[in-house]
C-alpha cells in the first residue's frame, strides 16, 4: 500500500524542523518524533489542514545494507500508519519515525507491536 501524497513528509527543511522541534519518544528499536505542522515549510500548503497527519520513515543503511530490506520495512510501517486510528482531536501533526540498527531482525509482528506501543506512548491514539 502506497502512502498518499497528502500524508508524506518531504524536503530537507521539513525533516530538519522535526529533528529540532519535535518531541521524541522511543520504544525498543523505534524512535518517533512528533511536531506540530509548520505549513510554511511545505511546497504547496493544502487548503485545509484540520486533522491532517503527515508521516515519514527514516531507515539508514546501518539498519540494513540492502535497499530491498529497508524498503520492505518502510512499506510495512506506511501500511501500519494508514490502518491506525488516531485521535480525532489532533491538531495538524507531523510524525517522523527512525529505525535503529537491529530493526531488520525483528519479526513483522514485533515491529508492529513496537509501533503501536510507541504511538500510544506519544498520546496519538484514544486507547
UniProtKB/Swiss-Prot annotation:
Organism name: Synechococcus sp. (strain RCC307)
Keyword RNA-binding: yes
Recorded GO CC terms: ribonuclease P complex
Protein name as annotated: Ribonuclease P protein component
Gene Ontology biological process terms in this record: tRNA 5'-leader removal
Family that this chain belongs to: Belongs to the RnpA family.
A Pfam short name: Ribonuclease_P
Subunit composition and interactions: Consists of a catalytic RNA component (M1 or rnpB) and a protein subunit.
Amino acid at each position: 500500500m502506497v502512502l498518499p501524497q497528502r500524508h508524506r513528509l518531504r524536503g530537507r527543511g521539513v525533516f530538519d524542523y522535526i529533528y529540532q522541534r519535535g518531541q521524541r519518544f522511543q520504544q525498543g528499536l523505534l524512535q518517533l518524533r512528533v511536531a506540530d505542522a509548520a505549513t510554511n515549510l511545505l511546497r504547496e500548503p493544502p487548503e485545509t489542514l484540520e486533522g491532517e497527519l503527515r508521516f515519514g520513515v527514516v531507515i539508514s543503511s546501518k539498519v540494513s545494507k540492502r535497499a530491498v530490506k529497508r524498503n520492505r520495512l518502510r512499506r510495512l510501517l506506511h501500511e501500519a500508519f494508514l490502518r491506525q486510528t488516531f485521535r480525532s482531536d489532533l491538531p495538524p501533526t507531523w510524525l517522523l519515525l527512525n529505525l535503529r540498527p537491529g530493526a531488520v531482525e525483528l519479526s513483522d509482528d514485533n515491529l508492529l507491536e513496537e509501533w503501536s506501543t510507541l504511538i500510544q506512548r506519544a498520546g496519538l491514539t484514544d486507547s
